[in-house]
Amino acid sequence: MAWFRPGETAVRRDVFRGKVWSAQALHVVEDGAEALVVGCLPGADVLAPTTWIEWLLTGDEEARIRALPNLADGSWRLGRWSWRDTAHLQWVPPDTWFSVNAFYDVSDGHRLANWYVNFQRPVHRTDLGFDTFDLLLDLVVAPDLSRWEWKDEDEYAHGRRLGVVSEADHRAVEKARAQAVRMIEERRTPFTREADWRAWRPDPGRPSPSLPAGVLTSGLGPAL
């Protein structure tokens, strides 16, 4: 397997039943056997479901609610979006049912705002970056790791009812929940690197990454 070099663009694609649900251009920070670490800044190029974009722009909860049925029946449409307001690092290990994100408030001195465990299918690496599928459930963790709370459990349950989250997914997520909490409690990687992650600053001279041509079709792996 070829490693990505720091500074290269890696594309995260969320793929459902062989079709791209979202795509995000990210900067590679480091890559190795333990994990791929990628960064995102305001201005990064994103393809996202139009219902999600509508919700972000208007706050219309009805638009957000429509997203899951559209996902379940394959009728979603994608629109262009630029990442806004926050920067984040994403720690993406192989063969694991979650990634760990560190979100920074760029309006407040690049302060580490929170950790965010995103439950997802194990990644399939591609020439463009990696493919996965967001399983709707998240764990939000305080910057000092002192407390955490589950997020979007109702959405996760609805995804199960609609068949977006399969029973096999659910069984894996139940195990991954316990694994993620143990990592926090035991301050294991990436949380052992808290000081490094707090100190991370992007290169201000580097342009925002863009999505490449063919992002919707190129090198799609097995149906996720």
Language model region names:
Residues 36-40, 111-118, 146-154:
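Short, well-ordered strand-loop elements centered on a beta-strand within folded domains, enriched
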